Amino acid sequence: MSPLECSECFGDQLLHRTYTWHLTLHSRPNFTRKRDTRSESLEIPINVVLPQRGTAEPFLRLHNLYPTPRCARQAALPRLSRRVVSQHSYPLNRFSSVPLDPMERPTSQADLELDYNPPRVQLSDEMFVFQDGRWVSENCRLQSPYFSPSSSFHHKLHHKRLAKECLLQENKTLREENRALREENRMLRKENKILQVFWEEHQAALGRDDSRASSPLLHKDNASSLEAMKKETALQAHRGRENSTLQLLREENRALQQLLEQRKAYWAQPDEKAASTEEIKPISSPHEEPHGLLPDPGPGLPSPFEEPKGLPAPPDDSKTLRALREMVSTLSAQPGEEVGKGGPGLPDGSQSLELLREMNQALQALREENQSLQVLRDENRLLQEENRALHALREEHRLFQEENKALWENNKLKLQQKLVIDTVTEVTARMEMLIEELYAFMPAKSKDPKKPSRV
């Protein structure tokens, strides 16, 4: 039964719903003839089929216009003389208006030029079309009711399936390749994070070394800033050294002042004794003492020229203290000369003070030179350690890059090998299928394989 014969015959299908309109065409009376006022009408039933979910767009059906019904159900239905419209009518937007002549014979589908689309349903990956009272796959759709499928159709279907399988296999390989690339990117991100941590630690170490001492070999761009920092540190160290030197000089001056006070007190005692015994003689000044007034003291008495024990002496200035003791011993070895000279004794004390200061300055200069040499040695040692660490890091980074390159090439070769294996497997499967098809077309006798004759 053709889809154009009767739409009521398809009412039992669950995949569409049918709405019917009865279109009546009236012809005007012919006024050319006298008293001929008859009007003729033609009733055309039109069906609109609304597909359910999963089907194509709505389509139009047209009833049979022949006088005799071509379907048993259509013959059993009563004919309506007027237009019947369903409660749930659908707009007739697929109907193409064509001038119809009611005097002619009933027109066909080609004469009406109606746009007809058969119903379609898509299930999984296949499309089904309703044709000749049954649902048929779109790939297996018949062109006419007398069409008989041939082997070429199945061959085409088989090729389509093979193409679909090839596409699925290719998609699978692409997904695997994408997975491998994602894994490789994840590993590279981890390696970059590790290298970044190493680089940050190295930069922090370089910053600490720069704060200690400048490194012109590694930081040529920051030479000016490092020089300024070095100058500031040198100025601070020099100021600290000057402060320590001033402190030492103050302590030495304090010790010398105490020594002079002790000498003055010791010289004043014999003057008082001489004044009490000999009142006639004038009181001599402490600077005009006789030569025999300063004998060597006893073994239990301390010498007035010895350095007091309570004086603070830094442990690092042993040479300075030794020189000071030598100067004090030289001063104590010449007491008679100072007494004989009398008045010029004080200038000699100032000269000894000046000599001590000069010696202290020379010792401070030597100590500063030694400290600067020690600082330079420490800087050189730190620079050598930094160079060794940098060389080790560069070597490790180079080995790491070579290892990454080898891993990447290995992964690439594995992917290529897998693609080749898949291609060979696919070609082998196709060859087997072709051999089976050839055996299917061959007669029964030739199906038995024969051994090839030896030449």
UniProtKB/Swiss-Prot annotation:
Keywords: Coiled coil, Phosphoprotein. It holds the Pfam family Chibby. Residues 267-318 are annotated as: Disordered. Residues 160-197, 240-266, 350-421 form a coiled coil. Residues 270-291 have a biased composition (Basic and acidic residues). The modification Phosphoserine is found at residues 41, 86, 89, 97, 124, 144, 148, 150, 211, 225, 276, 332. Belongs to the chibby family. SPERT subfamily. Homodimer. Binds to NEK1. This is Protein chibby homolog 2. It comes from Bos taurus (Bovine).
